[in-house]
Design a protein with these regions (language model features):
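A short acidic, often aromatic-flanked loop/helix-cap motif at beta-alpha or helix-coil junctions
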Residues: 14, 96-100, 153-159
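Nucleotide-sugar donor-binding patch of glycosyltransferase catalytic domains
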Residues: 122-183
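Electropositive phosphate-/nucleotide-binding environments in soluble metabolic enzymes
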Residues: 14, 30, 47, 169-173
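Pocket-edge positions in alpha/beta enzyme catalytic cores
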Residues: 12, 42, 92, 164-167
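Mid-sequence helix-capping/hinge segment at a functional interface
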Residues: 1-43
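Donor-binding and catalytic core of enzymes assembling or modifying cell-surface/extracellular glycoconjugates
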Residues: 47-133
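Surface-exposed, flexible loop/turn segments at secondary-structure boundaries
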Residues: 40, 73-74, 97, 136-137, ...
Length: 184
């Protein structure tokens, strides 16, 4: 989407942003929200894909990752964090929605499943890369900040609930290419 007449904006109190930046010691790394949580198993890219993505990005540059999963998705969070070779991440599953919003707001980008975090990051005016595995494009049609990645061989107009696309049809390398393109 080049221009969206209904583009929304999400504003976060400056004091809350300052507090989170202080907690992170004003970390100047490129901050990516890893949206590993989702509404169900058919919409998830998979913990091993996310861990591989993080480890590959760590070889390429200076990054910091916020791993976003719901409180009932700690297993996914642990599967990812246990495989990360560098200690440059923060898990957010123990935070309330109110408390985690500033972390999303200070991020530079969202990469992950179609979930609430992608909406917050895009509404903060940041790029939001979303994997459409089992969700219609309408979920991301409302913002110019969305970039959608589809499983190889799929038509965006034919993906909907019940598509159940194989998450491995989205390669880690293709995601890195999109990140690099949008980052610069």
């Amino acid at each position: 989407i080049d221009n969206c007449k209904t583009e929304t904006n999400f504003f976060i109190d400056k004091d809350r942003i300052i507090k989170v930046n202080e907690e992170l010691n004003k970390n100047n790394s490129y901050k990516i929200v890893i949206g590993a949580g989702s509404s169900g198993p058919t919409t998830r890219w998979g913990s091993s894909n996310f861990a591989d993505l993080i480890n590959n990005l760590n070889k390429l540059g200076d990054y910091f990752f916020f791993i976003l999963c719901g409180p009932n998705e700690k297993k996914i969070e642990n599967e990812i964090s246990s495989k990360i070779s560098k200690n440059n991440f923060l898990t957010l599953s123990d935070k309330t929605i109110y408390d985690l919003i500033p972390y999303l707001g200070i991020s530079d980008m969202y990469v992950g499943n179609d979930s609430f975090g992608s909406h917050i990051v895009s509404q903060c005016g940041k790029k939001s890369i979303v994997f459409l595995l089992d969700a219609p494009k309408a979920y991301t049609d409302y913002s110019k900040n969305y970039y959608r990645i589809l499983p190889e061989g799929y038509d965006i107009n034919k993906i909907t609930h019940g598509t159940n696309a194989d998450p491995n049809l989205i390669s880690v390398n293709s995601v890195i290419e999109v990140i690099n393109k949008l980052k610069n």
